[in-house]
Amino acid sequence: MRFVRPRSRLFAAAFAASLAASPAFAMDIDSYWEYADPAASEARFRSLLEQVRGDARLEVQTQIARTFSLRRDFAQAHRLLDEVEPQLATAGAAPRVRYLLERGRTFNSAGEKDRARPLFVEAWEIAGAAGLEGLAVDAAHMVPIVVGGAEGAEWTRRGVELARRSTDAKARAMLPALLNNHAWNLHDEGRYAEALPVFREAEVAWLATGRQPQGRIARWSVARCLRSLGRYDEALGIQRALEQEWAAAGQADGYVYEEIAELLDATGKPDQAQPYFRRAADELGKDAWFVEKEPRRLARLRSRGG
């Protein structure tokens, strides 16, 4: 049993928000996004559409399509992208890459992952050749979502390498989440000693963004890796500190409770672990994703919690 957090959900919102929040995007179309409200984003993009021409207009149109994909209106998203497609023959690299990304994202969200993969790969190739490093990193981040496994891990590594050396603000904004994914790929392969410095790098990168919740989750990941390395006292110290920080913020984190329980149990303190197993079960039992995806894990927490 791996005892990890659902990383695909952990950083998705922060990943998107970090793009929009970057100061470098003051005049960039990414700054018009409000990912939690696709309808509001559509209104912003339609207003912007009246102010731009040429390639910029095509880019905006791809983002309007994305607002429909996020609302799971895939047919409308594809219709809007169909309108863009014939205009790409004379367009520059940026609208072509954005078109490929949004077509791919629409297929992926609709469950057609096989159709999405070649589009993301082509987006990576075009963006890389054109020096559009932010869009290239975006493409590299999307491929693992549709392929997984060793191939997905390799694409994450490519994205990390490019983002690390890039001076592009969009690419740099993606680095924390990519580092998180890269670290978990190493961890999942049992390469704990290699994963630990990457987890630490991700923590530093998240804290640099000022996003405290994501910073705490990154520290949790460091501690989780320390547990895998058998460094229980260090891991427990971090989880105890996180417990206090979440409490000070008026929140409870079931994953922190779970780790404290596991660490106390691993160090021969089952009586101290029991109430933390119970708290973990109570908190994580409120999470619909956890209940659906981790039934055996939840059952174990409840059993150990008494």
Predicted regions and their residues:
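Terminal, low-structured helical/coil segments at or just beyond the last alpha-helical repeat
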Residues: R279-G306
